[in-house]
UniProtKB/Swiss-Prot annotation:
NADP(+) binds at T115, I116, T117, R122, K299, G349, T350, V351, T352, R353, H354, N367. It comes from Macaca fascicularis (Crab-eating macaque). It is found in: Mitochondrion. Substrate binds at T117, S134, P135, N136, G137, T138, I139, R140, R149, R172. This is Isocitrate dehydrogenase [NADP], mitochondrial.
Amino acid sequence: MAGYLRVVRSLCRASGSRPAWAPAALTAPTSQEQTRRHYADKRIKVAKPVVEMDGDEMTRIIWQFIKEKLILPHVDIQLKYFDLGLPNRDQTDDQVTIDSALATQKYSVAVKCATITPDEARVEEFKLKKMWKSPNGTIRNILGGTVFREPIICKNIPRLVPGWTKPITIGRHAHGDQYKATDFVADRAGTFKMVFTPKDGSGVKEWEVYNFPAGGVGMGMYNTDESISGFAHSCFQYAIQKKWPLYMSTKNTILKAYDGRFKDIFQEIFDKHYKTDFDKNKIWYEHRLIDDMVAQVLKSSGGFVWACKNYDGDVQSDILAQGFGSLGLMTSVLVCPDGKTIEAEAAHGTVTRHYREHQKGRPTSTNPIASIFAWTRGLEHRGKLDGNQDLIRFAQTLEKVCVETVESGAMTKDLAGCIHGLSNVKLNEHFLNTTDFLDTIKSNLDRALGRQ
Protein backbone atom coordinates (compact mmCIF):
# COMPACT_ATOMS: atom_id res chain seq x y z
CA MET A 1 0.00 0.00 0.00
CA ALA A 2 2.75 2.45 0.95
CA GLY A 3 4.51 1.64 -2.31
CA TYR A 4 1.32 2.33 -4.24
CA LEU A 5 0.92 5.75 -2.64
CA ARG A 6 4.56 6.62 -3.34
CA VAL A 7 4.20 5.72 -7.02
CA VAL A 8 0.96 7.59 -7.66
CA ARG A 9 2.08 10.65 -5.69
CA SER A 10 5.34 10.79 -7.60
CA LEU A 11 3.36 10.58 -10.83
CA CYS A 12 1.16 13.47 -9.76
CA ARG A 13 4.22 15.52 -8.77
CA ALA A 14 5.79 14.75 -12.12
CA SER A 15 2.75 16.12 -13.95
CA GLY A 16 2.88 19.55 -12.32
CA SER A 17 1.73 21.10 -9.09
CA ARG A 18 -1.47 19.08 -8.95
CA PRO A 19 -2.15 17.58 -5.50
CA ALA A 20 -2.16 13.81 -5.48
CA TRP A 21 -5.69 13.24 -4.23
CA ALA A 22 -7.61 16.44 -5.05
CA PRO A 23 -11.36 15.76 -5.16
CA ALA A 24 -12.23 18.69 -7.42
CA ALA A 25 -11.79 18.85 -11.17
CA LEU A 26 -8.37 20.09 -12.19
CA THR A 27 -7.46 21.53 -15.56
CA ALA A 28 -4.68 20.61 -17.95
CA PRO A 29 -1.19 22.08 -17.42
CA THR A 30 -0.64 25.83 -17.72
CA SER A 31 1.12 27.27 -20.75
CA GLN A 32 4.23 27.72 -18.60
CA GLU A 33 4.22 24.01 -17.68
CA GLN A 34 3.64 23.05 -21.31
CA THR A 35 6.67 25.09 -22.35
CA ARG A 36 8.80 23.26 -19.79
CA ARG A 37 7.66 19.98 -21.31
CA HIS A 38 8.68 21.10 -24.82
CA TYR A 39 5.27 20.45 -26.34
CA ALA A 40 5.05 21.20 -30.05
CA ASP A 41 4.04 24.73 -31.06
CA LYS A 42 1.54 23.47 -33.61
CA ARG A 43 -0.58 21.22 -31.47
CA ILE A 44 -4.19 20.56 -32.47
CA LYS A 45 -6.41 23.10 -30.72
CA VAL A 46 -9.49 21.66 -29.00
CA ALA A 47 -12.21 24.18 -28.19
CA LYS A 48 -14.08 22.29 -25.48
CA PRO A 49 -12.83 20.24 -22.51
CA VAL A 50 -12.72 16.48 -22.00
CA VAL A 51 -13.25 14.92 -18.56
CA GLU A 52 -10.31 12.77 -17.45
CA MET A 53 -10.92 10.11 -14.79
CA ASP A 54 -7.68 8.73 -13.37
CA GLY A 55 -7.51 5.20 -11.97
CA ASP A 56 -5.49 2.63 -10.08
CA GLU A 57 -2.40 0.42 -10.08
CA MET A 58 -0.63 -0.54 -13.31
CA THR A 59 -3.18 1.11 -15.56
CA ARG A 60 -2.69 4.39 -13.68
CA ILE A 61 1.02 4.33 -14.45
CA ILE A 62 0.42 3.52 -18.11
CA TRP A 63 -2.34 6.16 -18.29
CA GLN A 64 0.13 8.86 -17.25
CA PHE A 65 2.59 7.82 -19.98
CA ILE A 66 -0.16 7.82 -22.62
CA LYS A 67 -1.31 11.30 -21.66
CA GLU A 68 2.15 12.85 -21.36
CA LYS A 69 3.87 11.13 -24.30
CA LEU A 70 1.15 10.33 -26.84
CA ILE A 71 -1.68 12.84 -26.32
CA LEU A 72 -0.55 16.20 -24.91
CA PRO A 73 2.50 16.67 -27.19
CA HIS A 74 0.07 16.72 -30.13
CA VAL A 75 -3.24 17.96 -28.70
CA ASP A 76 -3.85 21.30 -26.96
CA ILE A 77 -6.83 20.38 -24.78
CA GLN A 78 -8.28 21.35 -21.42
CA LEU A 79 -8.69 18.22 -19.29
CA LYS A 80 -11.13 18.35 -16.38
CA TYR A 81 -9.22 16.02 -14.08
CA PHE A 82 -10.82 13.76 -11.46
CA ASP A 83 -8.73 11.34 -9.43
CA LEU A 84 -10.77 8.14 -9.16
CA GLY A 85 -7.87 6.26 -7.58
CA LEU A 86 -9.21 4.23 -4.65
CA PRO A 87 -7.42 6.30 -1.94
CA ASN A 88 -9.05 9.49 -3.23
CA ARG A 89 -12.48 7.89 -3.54
CA ASP A 90 -12.12 6.87 0.10
CA GLN A 91 -10.88 10.30 1.16
CA THR A 92 -13.79 12.06 -0.58
CA ASP A 93 -16.42 9.49 0.49
CA ASP A 94 -16.78 8.65 -3.22
CA GLN A 95 -17.97 12.19 -4.00
CA VAL A 96 -15.22 12.45 -6.63
CA THR A 97 -16.91 9.67 -8.63
CA ILE A 98 -20.24 11.49 -8.55
CA ASP A 99 -18.54 14.78 -9.48
CA SER A 100 -16.81 13.13 -12.45
CA ALA A 101 -20.12 11.80 -13.77
CA LEU A 102 -21.80 15.20 -13.40
CA ALA A 103 -18.87 16.80 -15.24
CA THR A 104 -19.34 14.25 -18.02
CA GLN A 105 -22.98 15.31 -18.31
CA LYS A 106 -21.78 18.91 -18.64
CA TYR A 107 -18.95 18.40 -21.15
CA SER A 108 -20.32 15.31 -23.01
CA VAL A 109 -16.99 13.43 -23.29
CA ALA A 110 -14.99 11.51 -20.68
CA VAL A 111 -11.99 9.19 -20.82
CA LYS A 112 -11.53 6.82 -17.89
CA CYS A 113 -8.61 4.78 -16.57
CA ALA A 114 -9.36 1.36 -15.07
CA THR A 115 -10.27 1.48 -11.37
CA ILE A 116 -10.39 -0.93 -8.42
CA THR A 117 -13.79 -2.08 -7.20
CA PRO A 118 -12.98 -2.97 -3.59
CA ASP A 119 -13.73 -6.31 -1.96
CA GLU A 120 -12.96 -7.32 1.65
CA ALA A 121 -9.25 -7.77 0.89
CA ARG A 122 -9.01 -4.31 -0.68
CA VAL A 123 -10.82 -2.73 2.28
CA GLU A 124 -8.11 -4.15 4.52
CA GLU A 125 -5.23 -3.33 2.13
CA PHE A 126 -6.22 0.33 1.73
CA LYS A 127 -7.74 0.72 5.23
CA LEU A 128 -10.94 2.00 3.63
CA LYS A 129 -13.80 3.61 5.53
CA LYS A 130 -16.21 1.22 3.79
CA MET A 131 -16.50 -1.07 0.79
CA TRP A 132 -17.20 1.53 -1.90
CA LYS A 133 -19.37 0.59 -4.87
CA SER A 134 -18.04 0.08 -8.38
CA PRO A 135 -17.22 3.52 -9.84
CA ASN A 136 -18.41 2.25 -13.22
CA GLY A 137 -21.77 1.38 -11.70
CA THR A 138 -22.04 4.79 -9.99
CA ILE A 139 -21.19 6.61 -13.23
CA ARG A 140 -23.60 4.45 -15.23
CA ASN A 141 -26.44 5.09 -12.77
CA ILE A 142 -25.96 8.86 -13.15
CA LEU A 143 -25.42 8.96 -16.91
CA GLY A 144 -27.68 6.09 -17.96
CA GLY A 145 -26.80 4.70 -21.36
CA THR A 146 -25.44 1.46 -22.73
CA VAL A 147 -21.95 -0.04 -22.55
CA PHE A 148 -20.63 -1.06 -25.98
CA ARG A 149 -17.63 -3.38 -26.15
CA GLU A 150 -15.66 -3.62 -29.38
CA PRO A 151 -12.53 -5.65 -30.20
CA ILE A 152 -9.41 -4.17 -31.77
CA ILE A 153 -8.41 -6.32 -34.74
CA CYS A 154 -4.72 -7.09 -35.39
CA LYS A 155 -4.21 -9.45 -38.34
CA ASN A 156 -1.34 -11.36 -36.74
CA ILE A 157 -3.14 -12.09 -33.44
CA PRO A 158 -4.91 -15.45 -33.83
CA ARG A 159 -8.65 -15.55 -33.16
CA LEU A 160 -10.47 -18.53 -31.73
CA VAL A 161 -13.09 -17.79 -34.38
CA PRO A 162 -10.92 -17.24 -37.48
CA GLY A 163 -13.85 -16.01 -39.57
CA TRP A 164 -14.25 -12.87 -37.44
CA THR A 165 -12.25 -10.56 -39.69
CA LYS A 166 -14.25 -7.44 -38.74
CA PRO A 167 -15.18 -6.23 -35.24
CA ILE A 168 -18.43 -7.20 -33.55
CA THR A 169 -19.68 -4.59 -31.10
CA ILE A 170 -21.92 -5.82 -28.30
CA GLY A 171 -24.29 -3.48 -26.47
CA ARG A 172 -25.48 -4.79 -23.11
CA HIS A 173 -28.62 -3.43 -21.47
CA ALA A 174 -27.12 -3.21 -17.97
CA HIS A 175 -30.38 -2.67 -16.10
CA GLY A 176 -32.90 -4.90 -14.37
CA ASP A 177 -33.81 -8.49 -15.32
CA GLN A 178 -31.94 -11.16 -13.30
CA TYR A 179 -29.59 -8.52 -11.83
CA LYS A 180 -32.39 -6.78 -9.93
CA ALA A 181 -34.54 -9.87 -9.42
CA THR A 182 -36.05 -11.17 -6.20
CA ASP A 183 -35.43 -14.90 -5.88
CA PHE A 184 -36.19 -17.35 -3.13
CA VAL A 185 -36.10 -20.98 -2.09
CA ALA A 186 -39.45 -22.62 -1.37
CA ASP A 187 -38.78 -25.10 1.41
CA ARG A 188 -42.20 -26.77 1.32
CA ALA A 189 -45.34 -27.22 -0.76
CA GLY A 190 -47.18 -23.99 -1.53
CA THR A 191 -48.37 -21.52 -4.15
CA PHE A 192 -46.11 -18.92 -5.78
CA LYS A 193 -48.03 -15.84 -7.00
CA MET A 194 -47.16 -12.49 -8.59
CA VAL A 195 -49.22 -9.45 -7.61
CA PHE A 196 -49.38 -6.00 -9.27
CA THR A 197 -51.04 -3.18 -7.34
CA PRO A 198 -51.67 -0.10 -9.57
CA LYS A 199 -50.91 3.31 -8.04
CA ASP A 200 -54.13 4.75 -9.46
CA GLY A 201 -56.18 2.59 -7.12
CA SER A 202 -57.61 0.38 -9.86
CA GLY A 203 -57.99 -3.34 -9.39
CA VAL A 204 -55.12 -5.51 -8.20
CA LYS A 205 -53.80 -8.01 -10.75
CA GLU A 206 -52.65 -11.43 -9.67
CA TRP A 207 -50.95 -14.31 -11.48
CA GLU A 208 -50.39 -17.80 -10.16
CA VAL A 209 -46.87 -18.76 -11.23
CA TYR A 210 -46.64 -22.29 -9.83
CA ASN A 211 -48.22 -24.55 -7.27
CA PHE A 212 -45.25 -26.30 -5.62
CA PRO A 213 -45.96 -29.92 -4.59
CA ALA A 214 -42.69 -29.79 -2.60
CA GLY A 215 -39.58 -27.58 -2.30
CA GLY A 216 -38.19 -25.57 -5.23
CA VAL A 217 -37.03 -22.12 -6.29
CA GLY A 218 -38.80 -19.03 -7.60
CA MET A 219 -37.92 -15.62 -9.03
CA GLY A 220 -39.59 -12.35 -9.95
CA MET A 221 -37.85 -9.77 -12.15
CA TYR A 222 -38.66 -6.57 -14.01
CA ASN A 223 -37.60 -3.89 -16.46
CA THR A 224 -39.02 -0.50 -17.39
CA ASP A 225 -40.23 1.07 -20.65
CA GLU A 226 -38.01 4.08 -19.92
CA SER A 227 -34.85 1.98 -19.55
CA ILE A 228 -35.61 -0.17 -22.60
CA SER A 229 -36.28 2.98 -24.67
CA GLY A 230 -32.98 4.54 -23.58
CA PHE A 231 -31.21 1.30 -24.48
CA ALA A 232 -32.85 1.32 -27.92
CA HIS A 233 -31.89 4.94 -28.64
CA SER A 234 -28.27 4.30 -27.60
CA CYS A 235 -28.05 1.24 -29.85
CA PHE A 236 -29.57 2.91 -32.90
CA GLN A 237 -27.35 5.98 -32.51
CA TYR A 238 -24.22 3.87 -32.05
CA ALA A 239 -25.03 1.82 -35.16
CA ILE A 240 -25.47 5.01 -37.19
CA GLN A 241 -22.17 6.35 -35.84
CA LYS A 242 -20.37 3.12 -36.84
CA LYS A 243 -22.40 2.77 -40.07
CA TRP A 244 -22.99 -0.88 -39.18
CA PRO A 245 -26.24 -2.89 -39.12
CA LEU A 246 -27.89 -3.51 -35.75
CA TYR A 247 -29.29 -6.82 -34.51
CA MET A 248 -31.33 -7.12 -31.32
CA SER A 249 -31.81 -10.56 -29.76
CA THR A 250 -34.48 -11.84 -27.35
CA LYS A 251 -36.42 -15.04 -26.65
CA ASN A 252 -39.84 -13.51 -27.33
CA THR A 253 -41.26 -16.85 -28.48
CA ILE A 254 -41.04 -18.03 -24.85
CA LEU A 255 -41.28 -14.76 -22.90
CA LYS A 256 -44.06 -13.35 -25.07
CA ALA A 257 -44.92 -10.40 -22.81
CA TYR A 258 -41.49 -9.69 -21.27
CA ASP A 259 -39.17 -10.08 -24.25
CA GLY A 260 -42.00 -9.10 -26.56
CA ARG A 261 -41.96 -5.67 -24.91
CA PHE A 262 -38.25 -5.26 -25.77
CA LYS A 263 -38.98 -6.23 -29.37
CA ASP A 264 -41.98 -3.89 -29.69
CA ILE A 265 -40.24 -0.85 -28.15
CA PHE A 266 -37.18 -1.29 -30.37
CA GLN A 267 -39.36 -1.55 -33.49
CA GLU A 268 -41.50 1.47 -32.57
CA ILE A 269 -38.45 3.66 -31.90
CA PHE A 270 -36.70 2.47 -35.07
CA ASP A 271 -39.72 3.19 -37.29
CA LYS A 272 -40.37 6.60 -35.71
CA HIS A 273 -36.84 7.98 -35.28
CA TYR A 274 -34.14 6.05 -37.15
CA LYS A 275 -35.39 4.25 -40.26
CA THR A 276 -34.57 7.19 -42.55
CA ASP A 277 -30.99 7.49 -41.23
CA PHE A 278 -30.46 3.73 -41.47
CA ASP A 279 -31.68 3.73 -45.09
CA LYS A 280 -29.45 6.71 -45.89
CA ASN A 281 -26.40 4.84 -44.52
CA LYS A 282 -27.44 1.60 -46.26
CA ILE A 283 -27.59 -0.29 -42.96
CA TRP A 284 -30.48 -2.16 -41.37
CA TYR A 285 -32.08 -3.14 -38.08
CA GLU A 286 -33.34 -6.65 -37.42
CA HIS A 287 -34.72 -8.54 -34.41
CA ARG A 288 -33.55 -12.15 -34.02
CA LEU A 289 -34.15 -14.95 -31.57
CA ILE A 290 -31.13 -15.30 -29.27
CA ASP A 291 -30.37 -18.91 -30.25
CA ASP A 292 -30.54 -18.07 -33.96
CA MET A 293 -28.41 -14.97 -33.36
CA VAL A 294 -25.65 -16.90 -31.57
CA ALA A 295 -25.42 -19.30 -34.51
CA GLN A 296 -25.34 -16.43 -37.01
CA VAL A 297 -22.62 -14.61 -35.05
CA LEU A 298 -20.33 -17.65 -35.17
CA LYS A 299 -20.85 -17.97 -38.94
CA SER A 300 -20.46 -14.26 -39.67
CA SER A 301 -17.36 -12.24 -40.60
CA GLY A 302 -18.34 -9.45 -38.16
CA GLY A 303 -19.03 -5.81 -38.87
CA PHE A 304 -22.27 -5.25 -36.91
CA VAL A 305 -23.69 -4.09 -33.57
CA TRP A 306 -25.43 -6.67 -31.37
CA ALA A 307 -27.93 -5.39 -28.79
CA CYS A 308 -28.35 -7.84 -25.90
CA LYS A 309 -30.53 -8.01 -22.83
CA ASN A 310 -28.69 -7.86 -19.51
CA TYR A 311 -27.86 -11.54 -18.93
CA ASP A 312 -27.22 -12.28 -22.61
CA GLY A 313 -24.86 -9.31 -22.85
CA ASP A 314 -22.99 -10.36 -19.71
CA VAL A 315 -22.30 -13.81 -21.15
CA GLN A 316 -21.84 -13.01 -24.84
CA SER A 317 -19.45 -10.07 -24.27
CA ASP A 318 -16.97 -12.42 -22.57
CA ILE A 319 -17.36 -14.96 -25.37
CA LEU A 320 -16.62 -12.24 -27.94
CA ALA A 321 -13.59 -11.00 -25.98
CA GLN A 322 -12.08 -14.48 -25.90
CA GLY A 323 -13.10 -15.26 -29.46
CA PHE A 324 -11.25 -12.20 -30.74
CA GLY A 325 -8.09 -13.09 -28.82
CA SER A 326 -7.53 -10.90 -25.78
CA LEU A 327 -9.25 -8.58 -23.27
CA GLY A 328 -6.20 -6.36 -23.80
CA LEU A 329 -7.62 -5.67 -27.27
CA MET A 330 -11.16 -4.74 -26.19
CA THR A 331 -12.57 -1.22 -25.95
CA SER A 332 -15.53 -0.16 -23.83
CA VAL A 333 -17.67 2.93 -24.47
CA LEU A 334 -20.68 4.06 -22.45
CA VAL A 335 -23.09 5.78 -24.87
CA CYS A 336 -25.94 7.81 -23.38
CA PRO A 337 -29.44 7.96 -24.93
CA ASP A 338 -28.91 11.59 -26.02
CA GLY A 339 -26.38 10.29 -28.55
CA LYS A 340 -23.99 13.07 -27.51
CA THR A 341 -22.57 11.99 -24.16
CA ILE A 342 -19.99 9.18 -23.96
CA GLU A 343 -17.43 7.79 -21.53
CA ALA A 344 -14.61 5.67 -23.00
CA GLU A 345 -12.39 3.23 -21.10
CA ALA A 346 -10.51 -0.06 -21.46
CA ALA A 347 -12.58 -3.21 -20.96
CA HIS A 348 -9.97 -4.77 -18.64
CA GLY A 349 -9.09 -4.10 -15.00
CA THR A 350 -6.14 -2.47 -13.23
CA VAL A 351 -3.69 -5.34 -13.94
CA THR A 352 -2.92 -5.94 -10.25
CA ARG A 353 -0.51 -8.83 -10.85
CA HIS A 354 1.74 -6.64 -13.01
CA TYR A 355 1.49 -3.81 -10.51
CA ARG A 356 2.81 -6.09 -7.75
CA GLU A 357 5.84 -6.81 -9.96
CA HIS A 358 6.25 -3.10 -10.65
CA GLN A 359 6.24 -2.39 -6.90
CA LYS A 360 9.18 -4.79 -6.54
CA GLY A 361 11.10 -2.83 -9.17
CA ARG A 362 10.72 -5.52 -11.82
CA PRO A 363 9.87 -4.68 -15.44
CA THR A 364 6.47 -5.77 -16.74
CA SER A 365 5.03 -6.33 -20.18
CA THR A 366 1.59 -4.76 -19.77
CA ASN A 367 -0.62 -4.18 -22.80
CA PRO A 368 -1.57 -0.46 -23.01
CA ILE A 369 -3.57 -0.61 -26.25
CA ALA A 370 -7.08 -0.67 -24.77
CA SER A 371 -6.15 2.30 -22.54
CA ILE A 372 -4.80 4.17 -25.58
CA PHE A 373 -8.06 3.47 -27.40
CA ALA A 374 -9.99 4.91 -24.44
CA TRP A 375 -8.23 8.20 -25.17
CA THR A 376 -8.65 7.96 -28.94
CA ARG A 377 -12.36 7.08 -28.79
CA GLY A 378 -12.98 10.01 -26.44
CA LEU A 379 -10.95 12.45 -28.54
CA GLU A 380 -12.56 11.27 -31.78
CA HIS A 381 -16.02 11.85 -30.29
CA ARG A 382 -14.95 15.31 -29.06
CA GLY A 383 -13.80 16.01 -32.60
CA LYS A 384 -17.13 14.89 -34.07
CA LEU A 385 -19.13 17.03 -31.63
CA ASP A 386 -16.94 20.08 -32.32
CA GLY A 387 -16.46 19.51 -36.06
CA ASN A 388 -12.69 19.26 -35.47
CA GLN A 389 -11.37 17.17 -38.36
CA ASP A 390 -7.74 17.48 -37.24
CA LEU A 391 -8.60 15.94 -33.87
CA ILE A 392 -10.54 13.12 -35.52
CA ARG A 393 -7.61 12.45 -37.85
CA PHE A 394 -5.15 12.40 -34.94
CA ALA A 395 -7.26 9.89 -32.97
CA GLN A 396 -7.62 7.63 -36.00
CA THR A 397 -3.90 7.88 -36.76
CA LEU A 398 -2.95 6.85 -33.21
CA GLU A 399 -5.29 3.85 -33.41
CA LYS A 400 -3.83 2.86 -36.77
CA VAL A 401 -0.28 3.20 -35.37
CA CYS A 402 -1.12 0.87 -32.45
CA VAL A 403 -2.46 -1.81 -34.77
CA GLU A 404 0.40 -1.47 -37.27
CA THR A 405 2.96 -1.64 -34.45
CA VAL A 406 1.56 -4.99 -33.31
CA GLU A 407 1.29 -6.23 -36.89
CA SER A 408 4.96 -5.33 -37.44
CA GLY A 409 5.91 -7.76 -34.65
CA ALA A 410 6.36 -5.35 -31.72
CA MET A 411 3.96 -6.31 -28.93
CA THR A 412 3.50 -7.09 -25.25
CA LYS A 413 3.72 -10.55 -23.68
CA ASP A 414 -0.02 -11.28 -23.64
CA LEU A 415 -0.25 -10.82 -27.40
CA ALA A 416 2.96 -12.75 -28.10
CA GLY A 417 1.47 -15.57 -26.03
CA CYS A 418 -1.56 -15.66 -28.34
CA ILE A 419 0.81 -16.36 -31.24
CA HIS A 420 3.52 -18.57 -29.73
CA GLY A 421 2.05 -19.79 -26.44
CA LEU A 422 2.94 -18.05 -23.17
CA SER A 423 5.45 -20.72 -22.13
CA ASN A 424 7.45 -20.24 -25.34
CA VAL A 425 7.88 -16.46 -25.50
CA LYS A 426 11.09 -14.59 -24.64
CA LEU A 427 11.68 -10.92 -23.82
CA ASN A 428 13.05 -8.88 -26.75
CA GLU A 429 12.71 -11.86 -29.06
CA HIS A 430 8.92 -12.22 -29.06
CA PHE A 431 7.75 -9.33 -26.86
CA LEU A 432 8.80 -5.98 -25.36
CA ASN A 433 8.45 -4.69 -21.83
CA THR A 434 5.85 -2.00 -21.12
CA THR A 435 8.11 1.02 -21.48
CA ASP A 436 9.83 -0.19 -24.65
CA PHE A 437 6.49 -0.98 -26.28
CA LEU A 438 5.08 2.45 -25.41
CA ASP A 439 8.28 4.10 -26.68
CA THR A 440 7.90 2.16 -29.94
CA ILE A 441 4.32 3.40 -30.33
CA LYS A 442 5.49 6.97 -29.60
CA SER A 443 8.22 6.77 -32.26
CA ASN A 444 5.80 5.30 -34.80
CA LEU A 445 3.19 7.97 -33.98
CA ASP A 446 5.71 10.79 -34.38
CA ARG A 447 6.74 9.31 -37.72
CA ALA A 448 3.13 8.91 -38.89
CA LEU A 449 2.19 12.46 -37.91
CA GLY A 450 5.31 13.78 -39.61
CA ARG A 451 4.09 12.27 -42.89
CA GLN A 452 0.73 14.07 -42.73
